[in-house]
Amino acid sequence: VPATAAGTAYYVSADGSDANDGTSPQSAWQTLDMVNAAALQPGDSVSFRRGDVFSGGLMVNRSGTSRLRITLNSYGSGDLPVVTGGLTGTCVRLDGDFIAIDGLQAESCGYAGFSVYGDYGSVRNSAARNNAAGIKVSDGSDFGTYANNTLADNNIMNVNTPGSECGTATAVQCNDDSGAFGFLINGSDNEFSGNTITGSTALSYDFGHDGSAIEIFNGNRNSIHHNVAVDNNVFSELGRGGGGTADGNTYSYNLIRSTCGAGCSQAMGLIARGRTSSFGPTNGTTFEHNTVWLDGPDSQAVVCHASCPASTVVRANILVAVRNSLWMDSAGWTEEQNVLNGPTNIVPSATSTTDPAGFVDAPADLHLSG
């Protein structure tokens, strides 16, 4: 088996054969079974031929190291190689630490396109579509990097049940719907940058519409910056439960726009919560230098409710929405240097303004003209 100081390179193509050794494009494997069975070592790579479609699930349960990651990538020219079908609802599952994905697509997987369970994972330059969750960063999956991915039309509801006796003390299944996630984040200390997330919106019995570009539940200190989110039901919703926390998450320099008609009628930018919510509190949330432009009749750019934590910071954003540009209850939080175009329930700080933002050509071009 040819090897270098960095490890062994393996190849997979639709024209390969599982009788091959997989160590060159000319002797590529054909199926994911060979990759799943391989005893991958730190520094090893598996390259999938562009333009090919691989059915089933891909699972890596070995770990790389900080110096020598295990890498899954692509070779050749054309469209990203696609993994579809999935095993137990996931197309690509990373159980080990220090595993990097660069240039794969996970499509129609049932539940998640990519599920990351280990630490120091990386998913870059990849794509996911037609899943309940494009990329799931699972509980205990920390210190990962997720950059320059395209997550489109991950609009499948994982749970969508009609409730009964809603609004009464005997309510059942009235707020359990979930799904249509671009990213679903249950881990901590991860970085998400340069991603484009579109079309995470779906009909919901409980909420009318549901879905989120970046959902954080029991995840802490994640950094979400320089992403583009278009035509999603919500940009990001924060929540906690079962003894977990969702504290210290930061959002900066993100572009958020929802103008897709009925599917965006209830669109929201950020949802944070206080201690009187069953999913709160979400402490220490910082939302700064973001642009939010929503035109749905019930749209709200930023909402921090249920006794909004005093540790919440909303700073230097442009917030445009029809129902509320900014809604915050309780007191003690920081609101400053914002442009608020749309109703608000607070008295803006002296450093904020309600003057029109002055875009070049909203919503098509949300650069400022000044």
Where are the model-predicted features located?
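Extracellular beta-strand/beta-solenoid scaffold signature
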Residues: 59, 84-92, 108-115, 130-141, ...
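Loop/turn elements at helix/coil->beta-strand transitions in domains of secreted/extracellular proteins
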Residues: 6-9, 41-45, 68, 79, ...
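Right-handed parallel beta-helix/beta-spiral solenoid domain characteristic of secreted/periplasmic
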Residues: 14, 29, 45-56, 61-112, ...
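Predominantly extracellular beta-rich ligand-binding scaffolds that present long acidic/polar faces
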Residues: 56, 61, 223-229, 248-369
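Solenoid scaffold repeats with emphasis on beta-solenoid/beta-helix
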Residues: 58, 70, 81, 90-92, ...
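Feature marks extracellular polysaccharide-active and adherence modules
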Residues: 49, 61, 73-75, 94-95, ...
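Short, T/G/N/S-enriched strand-turn elements that build extracellular solenoid repeat scaffolds
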Residues: 33-39, 54-64, 82-83, 118, ...
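Right-handed parallel beta-helix/beta-solenoid
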Residues: 1-33, 50-52, 75-76, 356-362
